[in-house]
């Protein structure tokens, strides 16, 4: 019975005169809010040809969605991942409700050629992020242990910094010893602040630098 009451609206646009993204944003503001990740996905895909949409979705966006999901809860962390990604790229921390706006401001795609390199980089970093939210996916036991300790201490404000360090390790800019030192320093720093009574919420700006 509920499906029988479902209504669809088809809007015809003129490619040269109408801005589909702006129309979509206007429609979205009148109904149930989409997540920041949903808005970014639509922004990324909307202006592409169908063949390019399929390629970007299948090769990049779908893997990003899968990798940025918690194994235990099946909770999507795509919005959080992109927020952390933007934090270390811009050295500014986006408001949780304005991640889409910040992403759109930084990446104004004109075509498939300008979009694909960004999606390639996002896909590379989400592979690191997957190990932060799912430490069991990290194959190295020592690294896995340090990530679990960081998560146990709930120092997720360090994620933007760790993503950069992890990528250096992945690209062999640093070795495993340096990675472990960085992960241990994060914990030591958090404990020292806790002991002297300093709030943990201020650490995000420190790690951002």
Residue ranges of each PLM-predicted region?
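Polyanionic (Asp/Glu-rich) segments that form extended negatively charged tracts
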Residues: 1-209
């Amino acid at each position: 019975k509920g499906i029988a009451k479902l209504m669809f609206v088809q809007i015809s646009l003129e490619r040269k005169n109408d801005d589909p993204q702006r129309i979509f944003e206007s429609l979205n503001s009148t109904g149930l809010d989409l997540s920041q990740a949903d808005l970014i996905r639509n922004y990324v895909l909307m202006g592409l040809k169908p063949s390019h949409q399929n390629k970007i979705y299948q090769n990049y966006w779908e893997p990003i969605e899968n990798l940025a999901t918690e194994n235990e809860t099946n909770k999507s962390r795509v919005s959080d991942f992109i927020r952390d990604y933007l934090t270390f790229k811009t050295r500014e921390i986006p408001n949780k409700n304005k991640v889409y706006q910040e992403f759109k401001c930084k990446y104004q795609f004109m075509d498939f050629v300008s979009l694909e390199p960004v999606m390639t980089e996002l896909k590379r970093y989400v592979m690191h992020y997957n190990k932060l939210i799912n430490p069991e996916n990290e194959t190295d036991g020592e690294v896995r242990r340090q990530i679990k300790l960081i998560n146990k201490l709930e120092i997720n404000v360090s994620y933007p910094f760790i993503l950069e360090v992890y990528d250096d390790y992945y690209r062999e800019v640093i070795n495993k010893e340096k990675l472990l030192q960085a992960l241990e320093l994060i914990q030591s720093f958090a404990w020292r602040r806790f002991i002297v009574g300093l709030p943990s919420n201020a650490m995000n700006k420190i790690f951002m630098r």
